[in-house]
């Protein structure tokens, strides 16, 4: 597999500004992610003393998996005080978008580089956001149908949308297998298809909860790298979090004030507010099989779906004795994660690292230091066919990744059209505009006639526009094969107006290039970069 790094002319300059140590951006974080001194400081930080307990919890969480020797060793390293590189993601259908895998590769890559540079073991940890309850965000994925040259949405359907956390959701296995079958119908059959389908079927048969199936697929892919997995909703982990839940409940107003103040500061720097929430407690409570947002009304802590209410002593008692009923929101999850782990760096997507920028004062309030916040690696897969099509139409890869192919497609259509025809139509439009102005001069002062001339001109211009558009449409139809090839490029490299990794599913890559494609024996060794990586399987 070939691998190269390209620099894109990105529309969003947030990550390039992190790369260049822009003082406005770095001032929003505890550490400058582009400076080596930041890593030296984090590597030398004193541990929090929770590493042995965490190692036991992670071992318990992963005990339904057959651990690799690399994972066994990393659990020991964690128990002995090794620091971590960490990142997380929602449990998406069949692994979710490709960037989930790329986030894990980012964690693996950075932890290895830190281990090699500092001669200290750094452990890669992936945090599964099983506490989330927005099932609409994880119940679907997309598949590229090569025969049609188009993307198709594949969705796992439920009779009723679950309101509990995804870790507490147990999908209908027959329906899930039907969803899997639908996905494979759209994918081309390769020598890898049957083996991949058997792996997915086995996971569905062997595991019951939504997040356990997700975990099993990730484990199958990344176990050889020694990646450790933990679900935010895992009950033994929640028991570890009880002291922090109590602190959050006791300081909820100060927490909310700190968050709002930091968010306002980021907005004053010209950034858009990322975190949208009305709560002033920033926790959820599981009640009546629903994940319910907690808010404080001045006297009571209230739940948003059943309107149950608790005085402070009651809700703190729940945190003490039943911490598994609590879960974090977007504000408290990073805080809890860093309170638990001895983290060198957190790896996040472009939006994630922006919302971490709104939390600096929250970390300081709880005397928890924000780690180095790093953007994940961004990766695109380029197959031989698409590379040949780019060459055929002389389209720069970097341009497609940023802008798509619409501009190049329109340019191609104009090149196939008759210049004389287009010039004559455009000349007729210009002639009409001159005639229109002459007629307006003739009827000046007579509003009825002015309206008549305006309407007549509008009809003529519309007809000329229609003539030109239909002519170019006919050119498109005459070049149907080329139009299909432009669609192929678009749906592969810039689907739905964005990067491939945001839409495509990992199963597509596994089906095309083999079930070992992401394994260390096949996948190219990566180096951490702020730029874009192109991989040719």
UniProtKB/Swiss-Prot annotation:
InterPro entries: Bacillithiol_biosynth_BshC (IPR011199), CC_BshC (IPR055399), Rossmann-like_BshC (IPR055398)
Membrane-spanning residues: none
Domain of life: Bacteria
The entry's keywords: Coiled coil, Ligase
Enzyme class: ligase
Documented EC number(s): 6.-.-.-
GO MF term set: ligase activity
Keyword hit for Lipid biosynthesis: no
Residue ranges the record marks as coiled coil: 422-450
Record-linked Pfam families: CC_BshC, Rossmann-like_BshC
Function text: Involved in bacillithiol (BSH) biosynthesis. May catalyze the last step of the pathway, the addition of cysteine to glucosamine malate (GlcN-Mal) to generate BSH.
NCBIfam families per the UniProt record, alphabetical: thiol_BshC (TIGR03998)
Membership in a protein family: Belongs to the BshC family.
Protein name: Putative cysteine ligase BshC
